[in-house]
């Protein structure tokens, strides 16, 4: 989205989500420090790294690197939370990741190693934040999201004012379509999507939910076909089937002789 800079759009998105949700939850006073750190690491720093990394890299490579969030999160759950990843789940995630590779196409890294580092760093700090969220067992997904959004909004706005420019002009000149996208991001992706995600993190093992992150390319393809009239290709079909097969295999309780 070209109208708004990266941190500005995220501050508006989380600000709207926070203002909507804060009325439905009580302040978690005993967890405020942890939530502040989660907001700083998992929102402000992560989005700053990821969006700046996306600027200097092609779409295929970006699509593959962003999907590292799932494997990194599963690995951290195994190391930090002592969860059992298991051979089947690891192979399933690997198979799904190969499907992402087929959909995205051959990555091109020449001269873009700095962008690669930023994207991998963004995925890593995001995974750290999700591990922290998984430890907030006494809070609901809506409570976590509401107060992460409230904490992250001023952080990202301050960061935007420091390293970006043209904020006021972007806001005042935005079209109805631009604001429609903002509200979609705030309500559908943030209020609905993150509420469900945070609830799962606080109630299910990280290694069990992380494979579902790899379904994102499939939802992106469906959205592009509906909204942008994109055509379904053979690589999309093969890659999509591999992703769904890989994710499904992580849910089956295989018993090996």
What are these regions (language model features)?
Residues 15, 21, 76, 85-105, ...:
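Hydrophobic transmembrane alpha-helices of multi-pass small-molecule transport proteins
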Residues 9, 53, 79-81, 85, ...:
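Hydrophobic/aromatic residues within transmembrane alpha-helices
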Residues 22-66, 74-76, 100-102, 186-204:
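Specific transmembrane alpha-helical segments of multi-pass solute transporters/efflux pumps
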Residues 11-12, 47, 62-68, 132-154, ...:
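Helix-helix packing/entry segments at the starts of transmembrane helices
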Residues 2-5, 10-11, 27-33, 105-125, ...:
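Juxtamembrane helix-entry segments on the extracytoplasmic side of multipass membrane proteins
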Residues 32-40, 85-97, 115-116, 139-149, ...:
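Cytoplasmic-side transmembrane-helix entry/capping segments in multi-pass membrane proteins
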Residues 38-47, 51, 69-70, 104, ...:
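Transmembrane alpha-helical core positions of polytopic small-molecule transporters
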Residues 4-7, 17-21, 73-74, 110-168, ...:
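Transmembrane alpha-helical segments that form core, pore/gating elements
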């Amino acid at each position: 989205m070209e109208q708004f800079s990266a941190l500005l759009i995220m501050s508006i998105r989380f600000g709207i989500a926070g203002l909507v949700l804060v009325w439905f939850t009580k302040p978690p006073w005993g967890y405020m420090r942890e939530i502040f750190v989660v907001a700083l690491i998992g929102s402000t720093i992560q989005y700053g790294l990821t969006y700046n990394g996306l600027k200097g890299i092609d779409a295929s490579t970006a699509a593959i690197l962003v999907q590292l969030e799932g494997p990194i999160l599963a690995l951290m759950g195994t190391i930090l939370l002592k969860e059992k990843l298991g051979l089947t789940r690891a192979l399933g995630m690997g198979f799904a990741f190969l499907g992402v590779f087929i959909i995205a196409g051959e990555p091109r890294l020449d001269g873009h190693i700095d962008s690669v580092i930023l994207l991998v760093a963004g995925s890593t700090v995001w995974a750290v934040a999700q591990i922290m969220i998984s430890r907030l067992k006494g809070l609901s997904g809506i409570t976590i999201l509401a107060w992460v959004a409230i904490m992250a909004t001023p952080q990202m706005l301050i960061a935007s004012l420091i390293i970006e420019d043209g904020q006021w002009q972007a806001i005042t000149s935005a079209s109805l379509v631009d604001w429609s996208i903002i509200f979609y991001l705030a309500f559908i992706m943030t209020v609905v999507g993150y509420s469900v995600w945070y609830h799962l993190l606080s109630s299910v093992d990280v290694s069990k939910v992380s494979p579902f992150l790899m379904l994102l390319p499939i939802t992106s393809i469906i959205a592009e076909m509906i909204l942008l009239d994109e055509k379904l290709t053979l690589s999309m079909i093969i890659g999509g089937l591999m992703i769904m097969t890989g994710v499904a295999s992580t849910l089956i309780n295989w018993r090996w002789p």
